[in-house]
């Protein structure tokens, strides 16, 4: 939510006020959290969070349940709700050391967010409460509290890299001393991932940094406890961008029904399913995740809590759109695109530094119209506000695509003339998708695509193929993201243009490469079947059957690999 780091919660954290969310106040100077504070927090005991248990020292029978819930919510990246659970446990038993440990833990960084400096004081104070109470806790609890002590400082440096490395070292020592403690191993894996979020493989898809240790650690946990939700979740993230995402399929299958009350954990299998060509499974995972999130938000009775509904909830709709698009389900894609756009429609925020990525997700409805050839709907979209150059660029792209398809080539030329300077403007490189990659990538792919479509419409196929080759180079350079940073594979267009040009052997090579990158997608299978037919190759029959299977949930009949 993300990263985006897939949806960067670090950026979204600043909009808590827009979400009508009451964050937990700093801990009181007294040992207990005051009842008024807890009323503001609005914690709920939730159903469907599994049966994971971490025994803690407490005198109150209900505290253990609140703590276990907080831990599972932490494993499911709903950190705000986890914080409320831990603080509720601390209210019920102010002498519970691990309750304060949890309330401190969740304020730290994770793979989808850096730490908010505004949380430093709370994290430190809660840690000190845990440390002061540790002598009354078990040896195991003391070990976890001691490891967390390396994560924070009373006066932290502006660059907290040294603290994050110290915490990773402390969790490694914790796991070394407690080799049978699976939670210790999971926290070690997460601490190592936090040192290189969403950057686990090099350009050759070889593991980099701590990735090999992360994978080995998580596989060791899963071998001993195949249903450890925290390990399964992190393992999906650890292998999804690898050269062999199939190795995460068993973890994905186990995770999809393991914690039905956690929308994010229900959604996570889609990250593997999309990488291995199980597109309908990705659709179903996101549909179920949306249902789980709807139930969770309904329980909150309108008190939309924290960054979870601003990051993770829209991510499920966006991913549903992506998966539905790849299996040709136009009606579902249209509905989920609209839901994504609606949730990203934060007009003031998307104009602020650091939040330009919202523009990209707000435009999902426009991308969907291009993807499925809803040209009349595109023509009716008014010119956007001029202070959003990326939005303006994509508007010209969509209008130009509609004009080409409606044989209004002069209009398409006019839109391309407006799109080109916007895409080339160096200022576009400063508009980032959640601090990971510039919106300029998408704008430049859009410009290359329109250039190619216009050339193809005029029979200039060499020029079209060259422009699309440049677009593919840009697309391939976008860092790994799910859904990808461009709405539809450029190779879908290149293959179609090559077939149109009577170059089926070249088209075949393009489609095979695209199927290597996005296995089992019907668009490429359709194009591959046509390219094989054009060459008289008998394999076309088998590929056509694969297309029919991939397209079993589709509601459109394609005539090419792009509309």
Task: Report each predicted region and the residues it spans.
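Alpha-solenoid helical repeat scaffolds
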Residues: 67, 101-102, 186, 233-234, ...
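C-terminal motif of bacterial Sec signal peptides marking the signal peptidase cleavage site
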Residues: 18-20
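TPR-repeat structural position
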Residues: 79, 113, 120, 164, ...
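Solenoid-like repeat scaffolds
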Residues: 91, 175-177, 222-224, 254-261, ...
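TPR/TPR-like (Sel1-like) alpha-helical repeat modules
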Residues: 97, 104, 108, 118-135, ...
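Amphipathic alpha-helical repeat scaffolds of TPR domains
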Residues: 61-69, 95-110, 136-156, 180-201, ...
